[in-house]
Amino acid sequence: MTKKPIVVGVTGGSGSGKTSVTKAICDHFSGHSILMIAQDVYYHDQANISFEDRLKVNYDHPLAFDTDLLISHIAALRRYETIEKPIYDYAKYTRKKEVEIQEPREVIILEGILILEDKRLRDLMDIKVYVDTDDDIRFIRRLLRDMKERGRTMDSVIEQYLSVVKPMHNEFIEPTKKFADIIIPEGGENHVAIDLMTTKIESILQKHV
């Protein structure tokens, strides 16, 4: 690898369209080697507590994440070092014993709801993107996803949204918008904003020699 890796942070609330924006970046830079890192797999290892206690954890709070490990891994990738990325078991709410070996790439995309909350992590990013989507749309997307993909009931999704997701979004996620270099309204449907973002990434790539 002859160029210094570029780190792109993509954040926004749950259901904002972060995945669509990330896919747009991957499609645009398909000629480059790309590595996607999801903040979700850096939830703390909870093997030492019961399953019942794991269900009580607030997974939308900054303290739910092993941010120190994530920071060390992003820093290592920027130094062209290999990392052992955790594998998270969403059914058991803890990490698996296995890890995934990841090599550094030209473009590293870091995606997650709270990646801009910690200054140490922000400082490792070359460009920071906030996907800004209407609260009602985000809630509907989360409702449909959790019922279809995670077997949740409508009542449980609504209760969690009102008691945890929405308050945490307002307290921790929304305020990080001010740290973004680019704000993309309406997520992956905003092609003009995505074009602006990819142009900015291209200019940074050209300088990273």
From Swiss-Prot:
* Record has Isomerase as a keyword: no
GO terms in the biological process aspect are: CTP salvage; UMP salvage
- Disulfide bonds listed in the record: none
Indicate which residues the UniProt annotation says bind ATP.
12-19
Give the enzyme's EC designation.
2.7.1.48
This one is known as: Uridine kinase
Subcellular location per the Swiss-Prot or TrEMBL entry = Cytoplasm
| Similarity-based family | Belongs to the uridine kinase family.
A GO-annotated cellular component: cytoplasm
The record lists the catalysed reaction(s) as: uridine + ATP = UMP + ADP + H(+); cytidine + ATP = CMP + ADP + H(+)
What SUPFAM superfamilies does its record include?
P-loop containing nucleoside triphosphate hydrolases
Q: CDD domains from the entry?
A: UMPK
Q: What is the lineage of its organism?
A: Bacteria, Bacillati, Bacillota, Bacilli, Bacillales
Please name the GO terms that the record assigns under molecular function.
Answer: ATP binding; cytidine kinase activity; uridine kinase activity
Major subcellular location class: cytoplasm
Q: Which HAMAP family match?
A: Uridine_kinase (MF_00551)
This protein's pathway reads: Pyrimidine metabolism; CTP biosynthesis via salvage pathway; CTP from cytidine: step 1/3; Pyrimidine metabolism; UMP biosynthesis via salvage pathway; UMP from uridine: step 1/1
Alphabetized UniProt keyword annotations: ATP-binding, Cytoplasm, Kinase, Nucleotide-binding, Transferase
Q: Which InterPro entries match?
A: P-loop_NTPase, PRK/URK, Uridine_kinase, Uridine_kinase-like
Say which species the protein is native to: Listeria monocytogenes serotype 4a (strain HCC23)
